[in-house]
Design a protein with these regions (language model features):
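Hydrophobic, membrane-interfacing alpha helices
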Residues: 1-217
Length: 217
C-alpha cells in the first residue's frame, strides 16, 4: 500500500504546569542553547581564551536572541496589532519569535561583545558562534514542525505532510482539525541542512584549523 501523505497531528504542548504550557518549541529552543553553550565552551578552551569570555558571550547571545527574535516577530509579522497594543510585545510566553530578528540581534551583540570584551575582530566571535548556531537552528526547526508552522508548498510526493491549519483553535478549544493539503515539510528539510552545515563547520574548525582564519567559518 502506497502512502499518499503523512497526517501530522502532533500537539504543540508537552504538558502544563501551574497553568502554563511547556511547548516542544520552547524545549527545543532551551536544549539548543544548552548544547550550544557546551560546544562553545569547548571551542573557547581550545583557543585558550581568557576565563569568562565564553560565559559573557553566552549571556550576550541569549539576551540578543530573545530581544531580537521577539522584536523581529512584532515588527515584521504583527506590527498592525503590536503598534496598537505595545505592552503585548512583552508577553513573550504567548509565542511569536522570528529567527531573522534573532540573527540581527546576535550580530549587534557580538559587535558590542568584541568591542567591550575581546578587543578582537568581530569575525573571531562570529566564527565561533556560527558552529553551534547551526545545531540550534536544526532544533528550532523541529520546534516549528511541532507547531505546524512554516511548511512549504503543496506536493504530491509521498512524504508530504497534512498539517493542522487551525492548530491554535484545535489545541486550545478542541475544535475539529482542519488539515492542509499535502505540503512539503520544509522544517525537516531545513533541519537536515542545518545538521549538514554543523557537521561541516565542526570538521573545518577541528580538522582544518579554520578558526585561525577569521571570517572563514
Amino acid at each position: 500500500m502506497l502512502i499518499d501523505a503523512i497526517t501530522w497531528t502532533a500537539d504543540p504542548a508537552i504538558f502544563s504546569i501551574f497553568g502554563r504550557e511547556v511547548r516542544w518549541y520552547g524545549l527545543f529552543f532551551a536544549v539548543g542553547f544548552l548544547v550550544g553553550y557546551a560546544i562553545e565552551e569547548r571551542i573557547y578552551k581550545h583557543d585558550n581564551a581568557p576565563a569568562g569570555w565564553c560565559d559573557k558571550a553566552f549571556i550576550y547571545t541569549i539576551i540578543a536572541t530573545i530581544i531580537g527574535a521577539r522584536l523581529g516577530h512584532c515588527l515584521f509579522y504583527g506590527w498592525e496589532y503590536y503598534s496598537a497594543h505595545p505592552l503585548d510585545i512583552l508577553k513573550i510566553w504567548e509565542g511569536g519569535l522570528a529567527s531573522h530578528g534573532g540573527t540581527i540581534g546576535i550580530l549587534i551583540a557580538l559587535y558590542i561583545f568584541s568591542r567591550r570584551v575581546t578587543h578582537r575582530d568581530m569575525l573571531w566571535a562570529v566564527d565561533r558562534l556560527a558552529i553551534p548556531t547551526a545545531l540550534v537552528g536544526a532544533l528550532i526547526r523541529m520546534g516549528n514542525l511541532m507547531n505546524h508552522e512554516i511548511y512549504g508548498h503543496a506536493t504530491s510526493l509521498p512524504w508530504g505532510f497534512r498539517f493542522i491549519e487551525n492548530v491554535s483553535v484545535w489545541h486550545t478549544y478542541g475544535a475539529q482539525p482542519i488539515f492542509t493539503e499535502p505540503s512539503h515539510p520544509t522544517q525537516i528539510y531545513e533541519a537536515l541542512c542545518y545538521l549538514a552545515v554543523f557537521g561541516l563547520l565542526m570538521y573545518m574548525y577541528w580538522k582544518r584549523r579554520a578558526g585561525d582564519r577569521p571570517g572563514l567559518i
